[in-house]
Amino acid sequence: MNNIILNNGVEMPQLGFGTYLIPEDKFESAICEAYDLGYRQFDTAWRYHNEVALVKALKNHNVKREDVFITTKVNADALYKHPYYYGWRMIQNIPYRTIENAIEESLDNLKWGDYVDLFLVHFPWPMFMKMYKALDKFYKQGRIRAIGVSSFLPPHIEALKEVSDIVPAVNQFEISPLNTQKELIKYCQDKGIAVEAMSTFSHFRSLEPRQEIIENDIIKSIAEKYRKSTVQIVLRWLYQQNIIL
């Protein structure tokens, strides 16, 4: 398994296993099977509500903590103890301590050893700078090995300089053959920020494959030429760009 060396020297497996929308009754078996197939990077988040289940599954499978890389994310949803509806209220003025509490909750959920490998700001919410500042604090305490962002554009990343001297280790965002994101990829790589692809084969909040990619005539013709599946061709395209999958 190839590793990507992040800008602080931490090694991150290039191939990861996403845990979003895995049914609860199939979750543990899916995690164990993924591990047996060779996956060593697992991606979760507070809003997936499976952080505890992820650690439990890996422990039950007799996996050693040092043998896996775990990513989680802090999301605006975590700042409320009641259902959160997007656009329901202005959220710029969330207290900083509330954000710290949300991060602490994820750290407790993933308490296995004394660290989380990678912690991302899940989206550039109005309070994203407070979120990153809080992650900076936990990173410097040694409780997080690397911090980063998700779905951030250059202006968001540049703004982080106001609250932290830590350049994000990773920016996770949608990349696909129909949304190549060449400019954003170049920006991140020029800044030493590793790029991680998400939503390459499925739309947000859906497990259904994107037929416009799977059945794309150009991708299919390349797949036929090399006797591979369209999925394999797309994964190879990402892999050769040094993108985390």
Question: Could you tell me what each predicted segment is?
Answer:
Residues L79-N93:
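Surface-exposed, active-site-proximal loop segments in enzymatic domains
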Residues I22-Y35, Q92-K111, K130, P155-E158, ...:
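Short, acidic/polar
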Residues E11, G38-Q41, K64, K111-Y115, ...:
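Short loop/turn motifs at secondary-structure junctions
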